[in-house]
Amino acid sequence: MFRTVNGEDYSPAVQQRNILDFGKAHSLLWTDNGSANDRCETGGNCRESGQDRVKRPMNAFIVWSRDQRRKVALENPQMQNSEISKRLGYDWKMLTEAEKQPFFEEAQRLRAMHRDKYPGYKYRPRRKAKEATEIASRRLFSTVQPNAHRGAVVPLPIQGRLRQGHTFTNGKPVKPLTAHEHKQLTPATGASQQLDKPAPQ
């Protein structure tokens, strides 16, 4: 099933021929006889797998890297995917424009096929749940001040802000923290190492 790879396999002419042969033989965009999971990977109907979205068409780098990633993974089975990606990025940058041209042409062809198959398609990136949680926690942390009475951190009400930059904590004005004081906050515990200073009157 696997073949040995020698140095001649990396010549630009062989790489171009391999990628075009691979695309014709294996791309589901060339044929319509793939499984539901394969169609999902190439932008087909994904309802069987619980995903109801169309994937973006592959760009030139992705077209090139699909075959290259397999080769690198076979040559270096212990190499992590992140390291393979770095290596592929470097290798792609080292290719000349002439060597990249067939992959740009293939990507253009795939884009045209994608446009014909999904005429109303518009790329809509989804925000990951983890990113949304991190953004919400950053917003909450940026609007908290230490409570002078208990040493705990409490969110400030929006109405409690004064024009001079002072805030209210438990109904009493509190001077905002300086940059040095802000660094003393310990995000891991959420507590302050210093009590609030009363606002100047």
Curated annotation (Swiss-Prot):
Biased composition (Polar residues): 186-195
Keywords: Activator, Calmodulin-binding, Cytoplasm, Differentiation, DNA-binding, Nucleus, Sexual differentiation, Transcription, Transcription regulation
Alphabetized Pfam families for the sequence: HMG_box (PF00505)
A cellular component term, taken from the record's GO annotations: nucleus
DNA-binding region: 54-122
Residue segments, region Disordered: 163-201
Annotated compartments: Nucleus speckle; Cytoplasm; Nucleus
Keyword Nucleus in annotation: yes
Quaternary structure note: Interacts with CALM, EP300, HDAC3, KPNB1, ZNF208 isoform KRAB-O, PARP1, SLC9A3R2 and WT1. The interaction with EP300 modulates its DNA-binding activity. The interaction with KPNB1 is sensitive to dissociation by Ran in the GTP-bound form. Interaction with PARP1 impaired its DNA-binding activity.
Chain's role: Transcriptional regulator that controls a genetic switch in male development. It is necessary and sufficient for initiating male sex determination by directing the development of supporting cell precursors (pre-Sertoli cells) as Sertoli rather than granulosa cells. Involved in different aspects of gene regulation including promoter activation or repression. Binds to the DNA consensus sequence 5'-[AT]AACAA[AT]-3'. SRY HMG box recognizes DNA by partial intercalation in the minor groove and promotes DNA bending. Also involved in pre-mRNA splicing.
Family according to the record: Belongs to the SRY family.
Protein name per its UniProtKB record: Sex-determining region Y protein
Organism the protein comes from: Orcaella brevirostris (Irrawaddy dolphin)
